Amino acid sequence: MIVDFHTHIFPKKMRENREFYFHSESAFKLLYNSQKAKLAGSKELVKAMDEQGVDKSVIFGFPWKTTETFKRHNDYIMDAVQKYHGRLIGLCCFDPFNSDAVSETERCIDGGLLGIGEFAFYESGIN
């Protein structure tokens, strides 16, 4: 069995308008400012998995700073896991310093995600 264990996917709105998030999310801009940095959705991911013989992918979003954005993205991950049940394994993502981190973890676990996908410290000085 082949499992891709670190896969970010993004909702259509984020893929089509990544620049909208650059002002408030500097870590996102740092990683995705270039148009060469591909943003894929769940449909594109599963198609690529089929083409490459990947059985399962562990998916998550991005550790957004803003609560509204990470909730929207985690909702997308939960929806993708339901849509491609058995193929996609979902983890939640958020800024670990956000005051809603604990409640978001609980919400995502209750929604079928299996844990936390990434604690990103891109700009914190922690390495």
State where each predicted segment sits.
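An N-terminally biased module of ancient metal coordination in phosphate/nucleic-acid-related enzymes
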Residues: 1-60, 68, 109
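Active-site gating/metal-coordination segments in enzymes
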Residues: 55-56, 64-127
